């Protein structure tokens, strides 16, 4: 995470990490077995024609393009118009398989057994796992980080340089960094904590939950989303409009 945060705070001087997570694939093991499909391991698996009507994609420009770009071996922060066009065309090709482009609804639709596969953020997994257990569902919802790579996101606290109450802001951040408080926040919002002291307070089953705290090897191809400038943003926006319009 320290390496990842240098993407927006090169000297680690200004931002204090609060939560973090990644983008991955959630799948219903029973439904995939019924369809005769092996569990996904790569983004490219989301182009399997047998998933027609069974796929939930993120209704988010950079998330959708992360999938199509990394599938092709490109950086998810590419500024190359040709690579963006290739990713756009792949997303258009994929559209007949997509049941819906959604965001928060992926979680509830997958719990309800409405789809076989969904693209989701890792921070939803603890809630999902608890719901599957409490509802006594006869299928499992498993999370995988695709082999090609993904993005890591880090929510941080910073104090603006023109803050009128700088001392109070620092006290607030210090309070949130207390291990006991960071642990409570993790248990409430369920997105992974970067706080080592809070992590040490967690039960072993949470510490060993690879959906929430993956092994570093599984993040070796991960990147952090970067702001690419207005001109490149326009390229992505126009490409996404074409995807949605098809």
Q: Which residues fall in each region the model found?
A:
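A structural signal for short loop-to-beta-strand junctions that line the ligand-binding cleft
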Residues: 1-27, 53-55
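Short beta-strand->loop
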Residues: 15, 135-151, 160-163
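A bilobed periplasmic-binding-protein/Venus flytrap-type ligand-binding module shared by bacterial periplasmic
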Residues: 26-31, 70-73, 153-165, 184
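Short helix-loop capping/hinge motifs at secondary-structure junctions, enriched
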Residues: 31-40, 73-79, 163-169
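Short loop->beta-strand "edge-of-pocket" segments that line small-molecule binding or catalytic clefts
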Residues: 44-59
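Ligand-binding pocket segment of bilobal, Venus flytrap-like solute-binding proteins
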Residues: 56-60, 64, 68, 76-142
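Conserved C-terminal helix/tail region of periplasmic/extracytoplasmic solute-binding proteins
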Residues: 108, 216-246
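Mature extracytoplasmic/periplasmic domains
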Residues: 160-220
């Amino acid at each position: 995470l320290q390496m990842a945060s240098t993407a927006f705070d090169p000297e680690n001087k200004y931002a204090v990490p609060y939560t973090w997570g990644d983008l991955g694939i959630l799948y219903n093991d029973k439904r995939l077995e019924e369809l005769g499909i092996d569990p996904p391991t790569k983004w490219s698996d989301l182009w399997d024609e047998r998933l027609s009507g069974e796929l939930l994609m993120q209704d988010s420009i950079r998330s959708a393009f992360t999938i199509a770009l990394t599938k092709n071996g490109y950086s998810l922060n590419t500024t190359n118009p040709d690579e963006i066009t290739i990713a756009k065309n792949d997303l258009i090709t994929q559209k007949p398989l997509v049941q819906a482009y959604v965001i928060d609804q992926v979680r509830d639709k997958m719990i309800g057994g409405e789809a076989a596969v969904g693209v989701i953020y890792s921070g939803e997994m603890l809630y999902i796992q608890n719901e599957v257990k409490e509802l006594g569902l006869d299928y499992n919802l498993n999370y995988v980080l695709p082999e090609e790579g993904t993005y890591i996101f880090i929510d941080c606290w910073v104090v603006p340089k023109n803050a009128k109450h700088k001392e109070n802001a620092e006290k607030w951040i210090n309070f949130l960094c207390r291990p006991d408080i960071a642990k409570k926040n993790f248990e409430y919002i369920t997105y992974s904590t970067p706080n080592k002291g809070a992590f040490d307070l967690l039960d072993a089953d949470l510490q060993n939950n690879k959906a929430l705290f993956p092994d570093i090897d599984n993040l070796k191809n991960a990147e952090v989303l970067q702001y690419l400038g207005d001109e490149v943003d326009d390229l992505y926006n126009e490409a996404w409009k074409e995807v949605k319009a098809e």
